[in-house]
Every structure is written in C-alpha cells, then in structure tokens.
C-alpha cells in the first residue's frame, strides 16, 4: 500500500464521522480476531481488520471503491467475535451508502427500487399477489377443509410478511406458512399491500428506500390494527 501520512483533516471523513461512534471504531485492538472468522478474509487483499485501519487512516475513497465491501456477506461473525464489540456490519452498510446508487453492483439496487415502487421486490400487482395467495389457500383446503385465508383482516394479532419470491416462483411454499398459523390457532392476516418480507435496501445502503419501505409497511400494520409483525423470512 506504500507509506501513509495521516492528518487530522484527512481523518475527518464522511465514513469515519458516520460510522465512528455507532460502530465503536476507535476501540479496535488490531488483534485480528475478526479476520480469523471472516468467510471473505483476504479476498481482494482485504479483511475486517484492514477495513478498520483504512478508515482510521482516512482512506474513505479506497474503501468505498473496493469490491470487498460488496463481497462481505454482512454475516456479523466479525462483530460477534470482536472483544471490543465493534459493529462491522454498520461500517459496511455505511460504506455502501456512500457509493452512488447507479454504481451498486448486480441487481440488488434494482430490487430495492422495485420494492419502493411496487410494494414488493418482484413487481407483483396487488391483484396478482392476492390471486396467488388465494390459489394456494384453495389447494390447502383439500388437506385442511376448514382452512380460511385471512386477507386484510382487521385486528389480527399477527401481520404475516412474505418473501416475494414465494408467490412469484415457489407458490406452494405459502402453504407451509398457512399450516403453521392454522396449527397454532393464531389470529393472523396477510395484507394485500406492503406484505414484502425482505428489504434489499438494507444490503445496498440505500437508507432512504430502507426507511420509506419500512415506514409504509408499519403504517399498513397500524391500519389493520395488528399487534405483531411476523417475519417469515
């Protein structure tokens, strides 16, 4: 990497300012425990310990432009292993948030945009989603004759969320979810809107979309008067 000169001015970078306090960045002991458990350590010549050192040196742009921040799975093994409790997940997510949205690799930002625009990742319309939910409920009645699918039920205890890949590609998986709620004799419902159970904006660092989609979903929970969100993912 060559000789690095650190100045107070250079150290005051967006990544350090945003991630510093929340992630306990300054408490790093450089012990390397984080790197020892990281599944992508040494990819691109990087690991969690090196990431922290680069931020300390004010090398924001090098971090932000690194492919490694996208190779990280955000599994949090490094965070759990760290004796000082440094929140590496927060650091990675913050670094991703500073990458221009159009430069986000792959399809993950497109998926996040779909969620914001259509209330789910797969761009399913309300009509198509409800039709699939009801279709699987009808099939389940062959096994459980008294099963009734509660869609938009007011005052239910549980607001059930769904991974949109299920109604899109694996609709029969929905029956497993239905069976669990039915066997538990739970008060539950699936909403016709904002039922998406995943949030790709969390992985891209798109904080605006992340907050917007969560707030809209929470608003829907309140409209139906549900007490608990059940994330089936």
Describe the residue ranges of each PLM region:
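Iron-sulfur-cluster electron-transfer modules
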Residues: 25, 42, 54-231
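Ferredoxin-type iron-sulfur electron-transfer modules and their immediate structural context
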Residues: 1-71
């Amino acid at each position: 990497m060559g000789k690095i000169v650190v100045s107070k001015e250079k150290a005051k970078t967006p990544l350090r300012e945003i991630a510093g306090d929340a992630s306990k960045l300054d408490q790093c002991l450089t012990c390397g425990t984080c790197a020892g458990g990281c599944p992508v350590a040494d990819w691109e010549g990087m690991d969690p310990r090196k990431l922290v050192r680069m931020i300390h040196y004010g090398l924001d742009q090098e971090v932000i432009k690194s492919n490694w921040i996208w190779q990280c799975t955000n599994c949090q093994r490094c965070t759990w292993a760290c004796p000082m409790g440094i929140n590496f997940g927060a650091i990675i997510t913050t670094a991703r948030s500073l990458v221009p949205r159009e430069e986000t690799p792959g399809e993950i930002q497109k998926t996040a945009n779909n969620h914001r625009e259509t209330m789910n990742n797969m761009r399913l319309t309300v009509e198509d989603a409800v039709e699939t939910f009801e279709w699987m409920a009808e099939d389940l009645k062959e096994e459980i004759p008294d099963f009734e699918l509660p869609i938009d039920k007011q005052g239910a205890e549980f607001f059930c969320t769904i991974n949109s890949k299920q109604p899109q590609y694996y609709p029969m998986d929905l029956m497993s979810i239905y069976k669990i709620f039915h066997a538990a004799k739970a008060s539950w419902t699936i909403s016709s809107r904002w039922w998406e159970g995943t949030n790709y904006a969390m992985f891209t660092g798109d904080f605006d979309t992340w907050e917007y989609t969560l707030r809209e979903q929470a608003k829907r929970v309140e409209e139906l008067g549900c007490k608990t969100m059940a994330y089936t993912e």
